[in-house]
Amino acid sequence: MVKKEVKPIDITATLRCKVAVVGEATVGKSALISMFTSKGSKFLKDYAMTSGVEVVVAPVTIPDTTVSVELFLLDTAGSDLYKEQISQYWNGVYYAILVFDVSSMESFESCKAWFELLKSARPDRERPLRAVLVANKTDLPPQRHQVRLDMAQDWATTNTLDFFDVSANPPGKDADAPFLSIATTFYRNYEDKVAAFQDACRNY
């Protein structure tokens, strides 16, 4: 069999998107980010609580385009100790990933509070907050699940959020899906704005 040479894509444009990654402590936010940025090769085995906000930059090439979206992932501490401080890092954030642990009903309920906090922190209240809801640790035995996935899906649908059930534990079931979704949504929104601007110029 002759192997086809995969040529690198020549990126013609790079867009940048700030994304708040939120959820209670220990739900696996940092582990998900690590699995995504390392393409599944690096899982955080030793837990270390995030203090405040840590920024991770992850480039995503949009399929069938020559455009790259750099996700500036704001890995946000889930502890109540930091909630009063972290909103200062959210200036200009209109995209978010809400993460909960399927074995913790409390972590699911807290996503609702995080969602409202993010909406209230928007500098421009007219712009929508585009977010996804992520059920993590779905590899755990069913008897440990406290949150039904259909219940989480219903809440996400009600609030116009995409929903993903994932596992950051290797090999990382669909761990990249939430990030790819955010990048694609940001790209499409950008394209819509460009098209609207071009139409306005033609009609001027």
UniProtKB/Swiss-Prot annotation:
InterPro entries named among the record's database cross-references:
P-loop_NTPase, Small_GTP-bd, Small_GTPase
State one Pfam family annotation.
Answer: Ras
An annotated GO cellular component of this protein is:
intraciliary transport particle B
SS bonds (residue pairs): none
- The superkingdom of the source organism is Eukaryota
Gene3D superfamilies xref list = P-loop containing nucleotide triphosphate hydrolases (3.40.50.300)
> What PROSITE patterns does the entry give?
RAB
> Which family, according to UniProt?
Belongs to the small GTPase superfamily. Rab family.
- PANTHER family per the record? PTHR47978
* Summary of the function given for this chain in its UniProt record: Small GTPase-like component of the intraflagellar transport (IFT) complex B. Forms a subcomplex within the IFT complex B with IFT25. Has very low GTPase activity either because it lacks the conserved catalytic Gln in position 79 or because it requires some GTPase-activating protein (GAP) for GTP turnover.
Q: How does it assemble?
A: Component of the IFT complex B, the core composed of IFT25, IFT27, IFT46, IFT52, IFT74, IFT81 and IFT88 as well as associated subunits IFT20, IFT57, IFT80 and IFT172. Interacts with IFT25; the interaction is direct.
Any idea what this protein is called?
Answer: Intraflagellar transport protein 27
Instruction: List the top taxonomic levels of the source.
Output: Eukaryota, Viridiplantae, Chlorophyta, core chlorophytes, Chlorophyceae
Q: Name the gene behind this protein.
A: IFT27
